[in-house]
Amino acid sequence: VINNALSQAFFSLSLGMGILITYGSYLDKKDNIVKAGSMVAIADTSVAFIAGLLILPAIFYFNPQVNTAELSDSSVSLIFVLLPNIFLTLQDTIGYFGAHAIATVFFLLVFFAAITSLVSIIEVPVAYLIDEKNISRRRALILLALTGGALVIMSALSFGVLTIFTEFTTYAGQSKSFFDVIIDVFYDTILPLNGLMVCLFVSFRWKHYQLTHELAMGNNTYAGSWLEKYMSFSLSSFIPTILLLIFCNTVAQKFFAYSLLGF
């Protein structure tokens, strides 16, 4: 549960993927990063909390026998199995057209959320190809579209369509599909590892005084504040320690079926 919660937090806030670093490079030196970061974190957490209060009670109300593992292990069954069943059940109370109208609006919102997330995610490799490889944005987008499209097709085929992708490999005593490998490696494992590496880089390579200087350029009250002291302490102490423990436990659980922390 802790591993999944951490991975979800990293993904929801776009942490550990280079997105914020890439977008941050486009900001003006005088922009208030402290205020902007606080607003994003508070808004994202609030929306996620409210969504949980709305969705989870509805799921258990319409389907009291639901397997809780389906809710915690993957969001795929939540979006494409459990919620559609709720929309079908709503036909008994608000009618066919009302239920389908709600379902249509919901999946449109999911579509736009996916598109906006894709834009931010794809900007990272696009910026790398443009800045480091001197490739035009058009060529970079075409290259990434072909690569990403191939991975998407392989992931889609791993849901029981082709055995080679459905039974892609085996580890931790279980057969894993290509989609499972993508989730286990890049979602559950790499995101916390990247967060750990950023903490170590800021604390021991870039140094805290440079971080303070950059943030203070857009916020005159940051230097010497309790937030500055907290960040300087946490980034070099308990945050990387927690991330390291969770990363090691995630690797042990996902790939060796063994829990280092006992949960």
Labelled PLM ranges:
Residues 1-115, 119, 139-140:
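Membrane-embedded translocation segments of transport machinery
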Residues 43-49, 98-103, 112-115, 128-166, ...:
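Loop-to-transmembrane helix boundary motifs in multi-pass membrane proteins
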Residues 1, 26-32, 54-67, 90-101, ...:
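Transmembrane helix-loop junctions in multi-pass membrane proteins
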Residues 171-202, 223-263:
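A generic transmembrane alpha-helix motif of multi-pass inner-membrane proteins
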Residues 111-118, 141-155, 159, 176, ...:
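Hydrophobic alpha-helical segments of multi-pass membrane transport proteins
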Residues 1, 70-85, 170, 210-226:
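Juxtamembrane inter-helical linkers in multi-pass membrane proteins
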Residues 14-29, 109-127, 194-212, 247, ...:
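Transmembrane alpha-helical segments in integral membrane proteins
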Residues 121-135, 178, 200-228:
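Alpha-helical transmembrane segments
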